[in-house]
Structure formats: structure tokens, C-alpha cells
Amino acid sequence: MVGFRAGDVPPTATVKFIGAGTAACIADLFTFPLDTAKVRLQIQGESKIPVNTGHGPVKYRGVFGTISTMVRVEGPRSLYSGLVAGLQRQMSFASVRIGLYDSVKQFYTKGSEHVGIGSRLMAGCTTGAMAVALAQPTDVVKVRFQAQNSAGANKRYHGTMDAYRTIAKEEGFRGLWKGTGPNITRNAIVNCTELVTYDLIKDALLKSSLMTDDLPCHFTSAFGAGFCTTVIASPVDVVKTRYMNSAPGQYCSALNCAVAMLTKEGPKAFYKGFMPSFLRLGSWNVVMFVTYEQLKRAMMAARHNWATPL
């Protein structure tokens, strides 16, 4: 378009909010099987209900071993168990934690052009906590579905709405917000690491003129952010998954869950599912951030075309 480049016009808060939720849903569609494999590996060793596969208590071995076992035993659809709740989660969760990040960052810097790492970290913590408070029930349902053996006769839930109703009925209103504490901790860490690392890598690449503000820069920044996030957030993520999936009374708190893991399974338990976590977060970050950047530009271009008379 002559005289107009979408990248030259800062996207509005609404564009960021809608774009973040949409991009996160697209990323989830591509990477959901890896997330399901991660959940299965993380809860392995704590389940009180043995799965009848004929191979003893250890069912899953590695990322692709987990995926192939699930497909063989439960069918291909099992890899997308909980997808509906996952998409509900991203539309409410990512829209807040990613879409509002720049606005909250500007609030902390009071509009200053210089943005220090402290302001970035505070913005990441704030939007991460806000997103969890809003979207926690969708995360609980998603994890329960992913952990559930689709081939078993005794399914805990038979649909997304059934899961919301059953949890509220059997565990009370608080059951839908189970694990909010560890999830806020996890997402404060994830948000700070993911968004701040993406911010810093992208700024460094642009300031050093190694790359321009385009797809290769977005890809590199997103991949680096995914790796850093996985390394830092994995222990909290494992505790969060175990605690949210636990039966009522199994753990009295998230801390009790962490202590039980350390006592029974050792320190390595906190990095169970690390490879699928990295594959998922790395690929999720790449798809989400690249899509998000392109969506922002496309939406700003469409907005300009709509506002400009022919």
C-alpha cells in the first residue's frame, strides 16, 4: 500500500487484545498434542488408578512414545482431549496476559519511552495474575480432560460443560479455581520470562541491526523465549498440573504436593515432561508470536482501509 505500512502505526489496545487471543488459539490448534503428552508425563507416577495396557505401571516413555501410545490405546482423538476448554482458556487467558502487556507496561512507566527491565517484569507479573484469576476454571477442565484416559470405561467427564457442572457439584465453587495459587506463581514466572525475554531479544536484534522487524526476527525471539520459559517454569508447571488433576483430599495444598513429589520421586520429578514442555512451548511461542505480529499488522491495515475513503 503506497504511503502506508501497518508496521509504522502502533496497534491499538483492542487490536492487541483480540489479536493475542486469536493467535493463541491458532497456536493451541497446532501444538495441543504436545501439551497433552506433557500433562500425561507430568502426572505419571501419581495416578492411583492403573491403566490396563499390559505393560506395568510405567505407561509413557518420552514425547513421541507418549503420543504413539495414546494413539494406539485411546485413538487419535485422545491427543485433542480438552481442546474446547483449551480454546476457551486461550481466548480469555492470552487476551489478558499478552494483549494487555504493553498497556500495563506503559502504565508502570507512566508513558516514558525508556522501559526498564523492572517495568517489564512488573507488567508480566500483573497481566499473568489477572489472566489466571479470570481463566482458571477453563485451565482446570483442560488439564482434567488431558489427564483422563479416553479409552477407559470410567470417564470422569463426558463433555466440557459436564466437566464444569460436575466439578462445581462435587468439589464446590472452589474446585473450579483449584490450583489458583501455583498457577498464579507459574504464570507470573511464565509471563515474565516469555514476554520479557521476547521483548529483550527482539529489541537487541533490532538495535544491533542484525534483523529487521519481520518474520525471521519474530521467529528467533519467540524460539529463545520458549526455551528460557521452559527451563525456569517447568518445576512450578509440574506441581500445578499434579495439584489441579488430584482427587479431593489427595493433597492439602500445592506445597504439600511439591513435598510429596520430592519425597516419593526425587528432584527429577519436577522436570518430568521437560522435552514435550520445550517442544510445546518453543513451537507454541513461534506460532503464537509470529501469528500475533502478523495479525496486528493485518488488523491495523484493515482499520486504515476502513477509515480511509476511496
UniProtKB/Swiss-Prot annotation:
Task: Please indicate the ranges of residues that lie on the Mitochondrial matrix side.
Answer: 33-78, 138-181, 236-269
Q: Name one GO cellular component term.
A: mitochondrial inner membrane
- Cellular compartments annotated: Mitochondrion inner membrane
Q: Which PROSITE patterns match?
A: SOLCAR
- Name the reaction it catalyses: L-aspartate(out) + phosphate(in) + H(+)(in) = L-aspartate(in) + phosphate(out) + H(+)(out); oxaloacetate(out) + phosphate(in) + H(+)(in) = oxaloacetate(in) + phosphate(out) + H(+)(out); (S)-malate(out) + phosphate(in) + H(+)(in) = (S)-malate(in) + phosphate(out) + H(+)(out); malonate(out) + phosphate(in) + H(+)(in) = malonate(in) + phosphate(out) + H(+)(out)
Q: Which UniProt keywords apply?
A: Membrane, Mitochondrion, Mitochondrion inner membrane, Repeat, Transmembrane, Transmembrane helix, Transport
What GO biological process terms does the UniProt entry carry, in alphabetical order?
transmembrane transport
User: Which is a Pfam family this sequence falls into?
Assistant: Mito_carr
Q: Which residues cross the membrane?
A: 11-32, 79-101, 121-137, 182-198, 216-235, 270-292
> Source organism's superkingdom?
Eukaryota
Residue intervals annotated with topology Mitochondrial intermembrane: 1-10, 102-120, 199-215, 293-310
Each Solcar repeat occupies one of these ranges, namely 11-107, 115-204, 213-298
Instruction: Region Purine nucleotide binding: list its residue ranges.
Output: 277-299
- What is the membrane topology listed in the Swiss-Prot or TrEMBL record? Multi-pass membrane protein
What the protein does comes down to: Antiporter that exports dicarboxylate intermediates of the Krebs cycle in exchange for phosphate plus a proton across the inner membrane of mitochondria, a process driven by mitochondrial motive force with an overall impact on glycolysis, glutaminolysis and glutathione-dependent redox balance. Continuous export of oxaloacetate and related four-carbon dicarboxylates from mitochondrial matrix into the cytosol negatively regulates the oxidation of acetyl-CoA substrates via the Krebs cycle, lowering the ATP/ADP ratio and reactive oxygen species (ROS) production.
- Complex formation: Homotetramer. Adopts an asymmetrical dimer of dimers functional form.
Family membership: Belongs to the mitochondrial carrier (TC 2.A.29) family.
Q: What is this protein called?
A: Dicarboxylate carrier UCP2
